[in-house]
Amino acid sequence: MLDTLVPGAPVLVAGGGVTGRAVLAALTRFGMAATLCDDDPAALQQYADNGVATVSAATATQQMFERGRKYVLVVTSPGFAPTTPVLVAASAARVPIWGDVELAWRLDAAGYYGPPRRWLVVTGTNGKTTTTSMLHAMLAADNRRSLLCGNIGRPVLDVLTEFAEPSDFLAVELSSFQLHWAPSLRPEAGVVLNIAEDHLDWHSTMADYTMAKARVLTGRVAVVGLDDSRAAALLSTTVAPVRVGFRFGEPAVGELGVRDGYLVDRAFAEDLALMPVTSIPVSGPVGVLDALAAAALARSVGVGATAIADAVALFRLGRHRAEVVAVADGIRYVDDSKATNPHAALVSVLAYPRVVWVAGGLLKGASVDAEVARMAPQLVGAVLIGRDRAMVAEALSRHAPNVPVVQVVAGEDAGMHAVAVVSGTDVISISDVGGTIGTRVMVAAVAAARDLAQPGDTVLLAPAGASFDQFSGYADRGDTFATAVRAAIR
């Protein structure tokens, strides 16, 4: 399983971020000769100063074409797309390319960290973090040793390395990027929650995106969300010996679902009531579905109903996930900045009867038309920010023509001081509030949203896009929204 990894084996590590550091630490621990490549000279210098062999990405790309194999393996950070030049060159030179998850899986399965763990893996376009966190809580409530890792914040390699006591289970959240570079992953159980357009700027096609997600269904137990047509279709294609679905409605045999106000398991028991729906702290159908998905994975390894009910009842959402930041003058302000794609934004909007929608950012190649059409009856206004705001505006004009729309326009230059607030084609105000471009944009957006909102409405930040055009991440975007709201209502 690890034929290419022997002491002294030359391995190229692509990317010097958090993942790259974890990969370097693991390779060094087991005696491989690791070289780091990156296109950031400052990052390379920091590693070189600490004794790490480094090379520029351009040089590493050229090395792939030189006679004789310079590297026996490339381990890449998940953000590096298959079209990245060094990876294209490695593929052409027939050098294997793994991601950090692939490396972690192989090392763990080969016993490098002691007895192999049982991997329970969660993926999907939306709901991954909540579901994985619930799963981890269920395992802990049943006195199972479990570690929470993956796309949720801690690289799997770091978790395996830093915890001396072996864990029985890994509750792992994985993105499509991570799964693309993990071809041999075979988890104990895996779930695909849902599949909607996302990251099409990284994956070449929707089929490739779906194929990456389906890699979690290659182990003993495959679980899919039956209310999502794309996810449900994967159940008939998986090779897993145990196939399970979950749905918001009444479950058939082999499914988990809802009956008479209870979550019910008919997959791992004949007919077992797990817990009342009313005890789920995450409101709406999305909370029920996340709990069902987590319960399916937990039940697949024998976690009892009492532990599942206790874990969910005590569960609390993380920051920037439907987080109420203020209520003033009868208007509720909600930060759902984690809604970074159209499907997530749709689910968020549908949870409220009357919404002033604050949206926009980087759509990553995804269309918003279908989602805007479905949410249109809930919308009483929209305030659009970010680079791809015009695409959202066009969808609103087609599917919600009577909804007032305000666009907050900012230049690409981060040093720009003026932010124009535009309604239709007319600039209606200019704001110069100081601070970062993100701060100025959000202050203007909140002011516009307050003008549109009436008592009983919800001003909802559910952007439908990534944040990196104007913010350092979704957390920064959410924090900036909350700060702007609190300043506005003082």
UniProtKB/Swiss-Prot annotation:
In terms of superkingdom, the source organism counts as Bacteria
Report the locations given in the UniProt record.
Answer: Cytoplasm
Q: Which InterPro entries match?
A: Mur-like_cat_sf, Mur_ligase_C_dom_sf, Mur_ligase_cen, MurD
Q: Name one Pfam family in it.
A: Mur_ligase_M
Which is one Gene Ontology cellular component term of this protein? cytoplasm
Pathway listed: Cell wall biogenesis; peptidoglycan biosynthesis
Q: Name one GO molecular function term.
A: ATP binding
HAMAP family in the cross-refs: MurD (MF_00639)
Primary enzyme class = ligase
Q: What is this protein called?
A: UDP-N-acetylmuramoylalanine--D-glutamate ligase
> Which organism was this protein described from?
Mycobacterium leprae (strain TN)
Describe the family membership recorded for this protein in Swiss-Prot or TrEMBL: Belongs to the MurCDEF family.
The gene it comes from is murD
Binding locations of ATP? G124, T125, N126, G127, K128, T129, T130
Stated role: Cell wall formation. Catalyzes the addition of glutamate to the nucleotide precursor UDP-N-acetylmuramoyl-L-alanine (UMA).
